[in-house]
Each structure stands twice: as structure tokens, then as C-alpha cells.
Design a protein with these regions (language model features):
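Iron-sulfur-associated redox domains of electron-transfer enzymes in respiratory
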Residues: 1-141
Length: 141
């Protein structure tokens, strides 16, 4: 609901997992996520923690011991913008309008495009195609 950054969330149902889908490209604010994961583990629950490789390393370091019921899943990190850079981009991209939904990679335009799409509260849609340096064939840049 709040587009000021990306935050770690806990889901107990598959419906709740749906809200976590999609590319983020911004450093994640873990807030109390590590502590929550530890609490769930200490209470004998399974925990699946998904994040960037550095977030997973941070969690394991924070926990300080192995937990049999901890499952971690990291993904290839293409680099993440700082929260300040993201907020600046979002303000410029939406011209300060209230965002209802944000897709960094809108697959409705082209299946794996680099089109960012903001669905605004007033019903308008803003799209912006941005460079994808990870699929660039210009090795001189």
C-alpha cells in the first residue's frame, strides 16, 4: 500500500504470498524481519526466507546458529537502487501523484519487457520504457 520503499513481509497463506510477487529493484528494508524469523523458528515453525544473497547472509549471521526448519531461497541480484534513488525516481516518474500499484517489469506490454508501469489512484496509467543494462549488447558502455 505504501510505495516509499520495499519491506520484508510475512505470509501465512498463499493468498498473502501473491502480494509479494514481482520485481523490486530497490534495497529491502528488513525492519523486524530477522527477529520475527527467529521467533517463528524458536517456536518450532518452518520459515522460508527469500531475499537477495546479502539479505540471506545477513539473516544467517543474525541467527548465529543453524535451524533445521529454516529454508532460505536467494535469487540472482542484478543490483538494487538505494531507497533515496528509488523515491526520487518515483516522484519524477509519477509527478507526485498517488500510486495504487507499481510494476517495474510490466509483462502486459511485452512478456519480459523493461517497461515500468504506475497505476495511479485517479485511474491514470503511466508507462516508461527504461534501459536494461543486463541485456545490453553494447559492450562499450
Amino acid at each position: 500500500d505504501n510505495f516509499d520503499g520495499v519491506y520484508t513481509a510475512c505470509a501465512k497463506t498463499m493468498t498473502e504470498v501473491t502480494f509479494m510477487r514481482g520485481s523490486k529493484y530497490v534495497f529491502c528494508e528488513t525492519r523486524e524481519a530477522f527477529q520475527s524469523a527467529r521467533n517463528y523458528l524458536e517456536n518450532g515453525n518452518y520459515v522460508l526466507y527469500t531475499g537477495t544473497p546479502c539479505e540471506i547472509a545477513g539473516l544467517i549471521s543474525y541467527l548465529g546458529k543453524n535451524y533445521e526448519k529454516l529454508i532460505t531461497c536467494d535469487f540472482v541480484c542484478h543490483g538494487a537502487n538505494s531507497v533515496a534513488a528509488y523515491q526520487s525516481w518515483l516522484l519524477e516518474f509519477t509527478k507526485g501523484q498517488t500510486v495504487k500499484k507499481l510494476d517495474f517489469r510490466d509483462k502486459s506490454v511485452f512478456k519480459w519487457s523493461t517497461t515500468a508501469t504506475a497505476y495511479l489512484e485517479n485511474g491514470n496509467i503511466i508507462r516508461e520504457n527504461h534501459e536494461n543494462c543486463y541485456c545490453c549488447f553494447d559492450w562499450t558502455c
